[in-house]
C-alpha cells in the first residue's frame, strides 16, 4: 500500500541574483541543505549574475552539484535574465551596484534603478504568478520600491526587503548584554530603512526566564544604554564588520535571508514577531507606498503587520526620521527614472 508520507513535494524554483558574490556563495548551500524551506522541500536553484562573473558562477554550480544535496533537484546557472526568471517561485535579489568611495548617492541610485527596472520587467513577464521576492541588495527598501513599480502584476505584499539581519543583530546584542542564549530574547522591532537611520526598538521585547517571559526593560536596567549605545551598535554593525573583514557581511546576511523566507513560508512561532521590510499601508503613521520595516507575524505564506503597539515620543521621532529618509530615497530614485 502506498505510504502517503513518502510522497515527495514538487520542487520550488528559487532564483538568486548576484549568485557568484559572497552572499550568493554563502546562501546557495544553506538553501540546498533545507535551512530556508525545511527538510522535506526539494528545490531547483536558478543562479544569475553578470557576464564578467560567469566563470565564478559556473564554479558555484559545480560546488552545488559536488555537494550532492538530496533536496537539490537541479541548478541553472546563467547570465541571461530571462532564462533565470523563468517560472521561479522565490526570488532572492542580492545583485546590485555597490557604492564605491567617491560616488555620489544619485550615481549609485541611478545604476541600481537600471538594474532593478530590468529585472522587474523580466520577473513581470516570466516568473510564476505567485512569485515572492526578497530584496537584499542596498538600498534594499528603495530597490524593492523600484521592483514594485516595474512588476505591477506581482502583488505588492509579495515584494519585501531584508531587515532581518538588523533584527538578528539586535537580538544578539541584547543576549550578550544579559548573558543569555539569543533564543531567549524575542520581539525586538527594527523600524524603517535598512540604513543608519533604522530604529531597533526594545520597548516590547521579552526575555524567557525560568519563571516565564519577562519584559526586557525589567532585566536591562541601564535604559540609557538601550537608548544610545545599543541603537548605534546595531545601526553601525555592518560598517564594523566591513572594517574588520574588509568585506561586507556575507554568511550572516545569507542566514538572515533564509530566516526571512522560512518564517514567511512556514510561519512565525506563536507569540513571536519578526522584522520585515514591507509596503506600508499607513500603519503607525508611516506614509503609504514606502517600503518600511515593521514588526510582522507570518502564517501560510502571508505576513501581517502587528497592530496596536504603543509608541512613545522617543520611538516616534526615530521612526519618522527613517520614514523621511525613505521618502527622500524614493524621490531620488524616481528622479533617476524621470517618473
Swiss-Prot record:
Gene Ontology CC: one annotated term: membrane
Binding site for NAD(+): 22-23, 49, 96, 119, 138
Expression tissues: Expressed in rosette leaves at low levels.
Positions with a binding annotation for oxaloacetate: 105, 138, 169, 194, 249
Annotated catalytic residues: 194
PROSITE patterns from the UniProt entry: MDH
Location within or outside the cell: Cytoplasm
EC code: 1.1.1.37
Keywords annotated in UniProt: Cytoplasm, NAD, Oxidoreductase, Tricarboxylic acid cycle
UniProt catalytic activity: (S)-malate + NAD(+) = oxaloacetate + NADH + H(+)
Major localization class: cytoplasm
Gene3D superfamilies from the UniProt entry: Lactate dehydrogenase/glycoside hydrolase, family 4, C-terminal, NAD(P)-binding Rossmann-like Domain
Family indicated by similarity: Belongs to the LDH/MDH superfamily. MDH type 2 family.
NCBIfam families: MalateDH-SF1 (TIGR01759), MDH_euk_cyt (TIGR01758), PRK05442.1 (NF003916)
Record function comment: Catalyzes a reversible NAD-dependent dehydrogenase reaction involved in central metabolism and redox homeostasis between organelle compartments.
Name of this chain's protein: Malate dehydrogenase 3, cytoplasmic
Designated gene of the protein: MDH3
